[in-house]
Regions:
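Membrane-embedded, lumen/periplasm-facing catalytic core of multi-pass transferases
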Residues: 386-443
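Hydrophobic, aromatic-rich transmembrane alpha-helices
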Residues: 132-135, 233-239, 301-324
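Hydrophobic/aromatic-rich transmembrane helices and adjacent perimembrane loops
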Residues: 174-175, 330-332, 344-372
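Signature aromatic-anchored transmembrane alpha helix within multi-pass, membrane-resident enzymes
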Residues: 10-14, 203, 254, 368-394
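Transmembrane-helix motifs of polytopic, lipid-linked glycan transferases
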Residues: 118-143, 181, 185, 315
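Specific aromatic-rich, kink-prone transmembrane helix
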Residues: 102, 133-136, 154, 158, ...
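Membrane-interface alpha helices of multi-pass inner-membrane proteins
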Residues: 152, 199-220, 255
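Interfacial juxtamembrane loops and adjacent helix segments
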Residues: 43-95, 100-117
Length: 494
């Protein structure tokens, strides 16, 4: 394939994959609560993290107090310094919060659509870099098979989980970029080591160190990812009896961890906090983890639509009489990482394993590359059709929060009642899931208990408690339940 044709095809796939993401961005009308907490944390605010609202606010005043209250550059530098010392979110580093804070300098809109469009441009920049790197990563495997290379590029670019990751205002797109960069460096190093062409010099040491830093500084769960790739590297060096060279790569790991501490003083605070990982492992059995892994991730999230992929892989496996030794080792490493990360994750959600998406999907173009002629064309067409169908169902695009549109309307209905009271009984962070949807011109009174309500006329109350729960049993006759949304029950008090 000519270079000009390759470039045009690369550009076409990039434009299509970006277009799909722009479409789903246009459908995004609400936030996941973690996205709002990203704004609070990067701005080093207290409301919504350590303190709750108290007193009377208009919706606009409440939004301004929580979302981007300090848009100036000097304020941003102060917030970045505070986040460098302690970002208060000990299960994440300050990396993404620093980038997001700089991106928000001068931004003052409180409209949901404006915030989504502005903040997602960071992810689009990361995605373009990721896409370019993905091309070079796939070239390591299919440099002699350009059609298979571009098939892999298209399938990964249209992956529903990858799309969801791009339009999620959190650090996971940056994390995916870091994971792919490390995979590229490790695979390239393995190829060169097998050919005895790898140079153990300062340049490669620094590149490998940076690659490790770029992923572990994105999230503590990525230590598992680094460990799995590192174990293969160690195993291969042991096979070649180059034991002393293991020290070289161990040194890159230590240097990367040291660099993480330089970039974030609170990097080791997770070791002194109540650890979600160890706590989760001790509290759940193997069955408790394995069951959610299968039924939530594979079935509820509609991953059963990947059955055509599995059928093609099984067909090739049997027809070509393949063995496990012929499967790309990076795919096996990705499977091990995904199971381990999902097992130890505090929540059963795909965001913790989405960084392994390109490595997991690598098996599909690999299997198709074993076919010839008409069989290869049919298999390729079936896989592309599967990817298109997957991305067209909104249920497959995680974190879109379509259900919040109706629930948010509960906050703005019954305008004939001038008094709206919000009671916060639980954690301050629950207010992150209600403040962005307040009516700018309506007045809201925030209190901490039912006893603080002093209103003799009919009014509306929202309270963060379990679905359908009444704060005081004897009030059932006076409180009319109107619905549940954003961690809050909504009532009309007669």
């Amino acid at each position: 394939m000519k270079k000009t044709h390759s470039f045009l095809l690369f550009l076409a796939i990039l434009i299509v994959s970006l277009g799909v993401r722009f479409y789903w961005e246009s459908q995004k009308t609400a936030f996941h609560v973690d996205e709002v907490m990203s704004f609070v944390l990067c701005d080093y605010g207290d409301l919504g993290w350590t303190t709750t609202f108290s007193g009377e606010y208009t919706g606009a005043e409440a939004k301004q107090s929580m979302l981007f209250p300090h848009p100036g550059l000097d304020d941003a530098i102060q917030d970045i310094r505070h986040n460098w010392q302690d970002n208060r979110d000990h299960y994440h580093t300050n990396f993404y919060y620093t980038i997001l804070r700089l991106w928000l300098v001068g931004f003052q809109s409180y409209h949901i659509n404006d915030i989504i469009v502005h903040c997602l441009w960071i992810n689009y920049i990361f995605y373009v870099a990721y896409f370019i790197l993905l091309y070079f990563f796939l070239r390591l495997f299919f440099w002699e098979r350009p059609k298979i290379l571009f098939l892999g590029l298209l399938l990964i670019g249209l992956s529903a989980s990858d799309i969801a990751n791009t339009i999620f205002i959190r650090e996971y797109m940056l994390q995916e970029l870091g994971a792919l960069f490390l995979a590229y460096i490790v695979v390239k190093s393995v190829i060169e080591i097998k050919k005895d062409a790898y140079q153990y010099n300062i340049k490669n040491f620094l590149i490998t160190t940076f690659a490790i830093w770029a992923i572990i500084f994105n999230g503590y769960f990525q230590f598992v990812y680094v460990g799995v790739l590192g174990l293969y590297l160690v195993w291969m060096l042991c096979q070649k009896k180059d034991y002393y060279k293991i020290i070289y790569f161990a040194g890159t790991m230590l240097a990367a961890v040291a660099l993480c501490y330089v970039c974030y003083q609170g990097f080791f605070k997770i070791l002194t906090e109540d650890n979600k990982v160890s706590g989760g492992l001790s509290a759940r059995t193997l069955r408790g983890y394995f069951s959610p892994f299968l039924f939530y991730s594979l079935f509820v999230m509609h991953y059963t639509l990947y059955i055509p992929y599995l059928f093609i892989i099984a067909y090739v496996w049997r027809k070509k009489r393949m063995s496990i030794n012929q499967v790309p080792w990076i795919f096996i490493a990705a499977v091990i990482y995904s199971v381990a990360a999902f097992w130890t994750a505090p929540m059963r959600t795909n965001r913790y394993i989405v960084s392994a998406t390109p490595l997991l999907l690598l098996i599909v173009p690999f299997a198709i590359s074993k076919l010839q002629g008409k069989q290869q064309k049919i298999a390729s067409g079936l896989c592309i059709l599967t990817a298109v169908v997957m991305m067209c169902f909104k249920g497959n695009i995680e974190n879109m929060n379509f259900d919040k549109d109706e629930k948010a309307n509960l906050l703005n209905n019954h305008s004939e009642m001038p008094t709206y009271i919000v009671i916060n009984k639980k954690q301050p962070w629950t207010q992150c899931d209600i403040i962005p949807y307040l009516n700018d011109h309506r007045h809201y009174i925030f209190v901490n208990s039912v006893e603080e309500i002093k209103c003799n006329q009919p009014h509306i109350v929202s309270i963060d408690c379990f679905r359908g729960e009444y704060p005081v049993e004897k009030m059932k006759q006076q409180w009319e339940y109107k619905g549940y949304g954003s961690f809050y029950n909504h009532y009309i008090v007669k």
